[in-house]
Amino acid sequence: MSSFYSEPYYSTSYKRRYVETPRVHISSVRSGYSTARSAYSSYSAPVSSSLSVRRSYSSSSGLMPSLENLDLSQVAAISNDLKSIRTQEKAQLQDLNDRFASFIERVHELEQQNKVLEAQLLVLRQKHSEPSRFRALYEQEIRDLRLAAEDATNEKQALQGEREGLEETLRNLQARYEEEVLSREDAEGRLMEARKGADEAALARAELEKRIDSLMDEIAFLKKVHEEEIAELQAQIQYAQISVEMDVSSKPDLSAALKDIRAQYEKLAAKNMQNAEEWFKSRFTVLTESAAKNTDAVRAAKDEVSESRRLLKAKTLEIEACRGMNEALEKQLQELEDKQNADISAMQDTINKLENELRTTKSEMARYLKEYQDLLNVKMALDIEIAAYRKLLEGEETRLSFTSVGSLTTGYSQSSQVFGRSAYGGLQTSSYLMSTRSFPSYYTSHVQEEQIEVEETIEAAKAEEAKDEPPSEGEAEEEGKEKEEAEAEAEAEEEGAQEEEEAAEKEESEEAKEEEGGEGEQGEETKEAEEEEKKDEGAGEEQATKKKD
């Protein structure tokens, strides 16, 4: 996926101010360290890339050859459906483009905010401001990043809702497709039944035709038999006439009987002919009616078959249209899913990048806070030494003010010798011993409170970082090791401090033995300072134990 940014979005003034920021080197002002620490440089300009969103729609040209056979009403309905679907797709694309533009604007805003925060961080590093400002600044940045993450989560949920809606539409189309498949199977079943009926009607017609042929043969046979019978009867009648004529002379009384017999046979022949004609006519009528009925049934079956074929063709075209629509929607859904996944991955990369930057910034802040604490300790030690020197000078001045004018030179020489010895011994001791020996208790407690506040700030920053990113097993082990090492270092420092304190006490006792006479007030002051030192040490140890607990 292409990046969200392009070069035309940035003007020359913006590049000059934020993108092309020169590298700033910050040297630590900590005494005793000569190495310089270089501050981090601003982030490079975002990689330019062009953004292109291309959408492809499935054309309806493949449906035109099949739509020519449909009615005008069906064509109008299908065109209306296609228009409504196209308008819906255009609306969805417009909505997605608007959201994409809002995402781009949000990314630019976050980048600008990041640049502003980087500039503020550089200014704060240069000024060495208080750690509390850093904390408030980064807490605000963390809140902004969390709000941005929540917005991205909400957008993701909205896109998931749209995806669920598209899936519901797809399920509806699949259900409709299944219904159309069932209706097609029903139509095919009815078509098979109609075909079976047509086949049965054709078989019945063939049987009836065969029966008609057999009946016609039977009629012809009966006609032939009837004609033969008539011929036989006529032959018998002629033979009877001949015999009657031959016997007229001998038997004149048989003519009436022959006439009666002839009349009877003629009546019987006429009756047989009439019965045969009536039976033939009735049989022919029945066969004609049955043939007409079968013809109507065959015609109805043919009409039903043609209607079923037309319906099957229409349903097939509709199924193909639904299938094409389904494929187009599936393709669109796949494209939307790919785009959403790409957007989500890009947003996740941005969030991870911001989290990494925040983590590095927090680590740098912790490092700078530690350096600040070290500098504060050095400053505190220097202030303690200055206060000790000031107190020694004030003690000398007060002591000299009460001496006589005659012993001014002697007292001044003794005090200068004592001051030289004490100053030389104080310079030999460490700054930490000087601070615990002769600095006022309220100032020491104030410095300790500042140290505790700085340490609490560092621990709070580490705790927030740990909350924002849950540590893995390896990180947890490393943190445990670091804690153990820190505890071991703290214990070693405490032991070294105790050893130094013991050595300082020994040196002080030796110096106290050497400094005899004229230093009673200084001895009392050193005793008071030692008592205050012990009290401060007890209070510091109590605070350290409470902090460890």
From Swiss-Prot:
UniProt keyword annotations, A-Z: Acetylation, Cell projection, Coiled coil, Cytoplasm, Cytoskeleton, Glycoprotein, Intermediate filament, Methylation, Phosphoprotein, Ubl conjugation
Domain of life: Eukaryota
Head: region residues: 2-92
Region ranges (Coil 1A): 93-124
SMART domains (UniProt xref): Filament
Family annotation (Gene3D superfamilies): 1.20.5.170, Single helix bin, Vasodilator-stimulated phosphoprotein
Ranges of compositional bias, category Basic and acidic residues: 535-549
Chain positions covered by the region annotation Tail, subdomain A: 397-443
Positions of the UniProt region annotated as Epitope: 381-391
Gene Ontology terms: cellular component: axon; axon cytoplasm; intermediate filament; neurofilament; postsynaptic intermediate filament cytoskeleton
Region (Tail): 397-549
Linker 1: annotated segments: 125-137
SUPFAM superfamilies found in the cross-reference section: Intermediate filament protein, coiled coil region
Residue positions where Phosphoserine is found in the record: S56, S66, S102, S472
Segments for region (Tail, subdomain B (acidic)): 444-549
Record-listed Asymmetric dimethylarginine modification sites: R23
Subunit structure: Forms homodimers (in vitro). Forms heterodimers with NEFH or NEFM; which can further hetero-oligomerize (in vitro). Forms heterodimers with INA (in vitro). Interacts with ARHGEF28. Interacts with TRIM2.
Miscellaneous section: NF-L is the most abundant of the three neurofilament proteins and, like the other nonepithelial intermediate filament proteins, it can form homomeric 10-nm filaments.
The record's note on its domains: The extra mass and high charge density that distinguish the neurofilament proteins from all other intermediate filament proteins are due to the tailpiece extensions. This region may form a charged scaffolding structure suitable for interaction with other neuronal components or ions.
Family listed: Belongs to the intermediate filament family.
This protein's name: Neurofilament light polypeptide
Origin species: Sus scrofa (Pig)
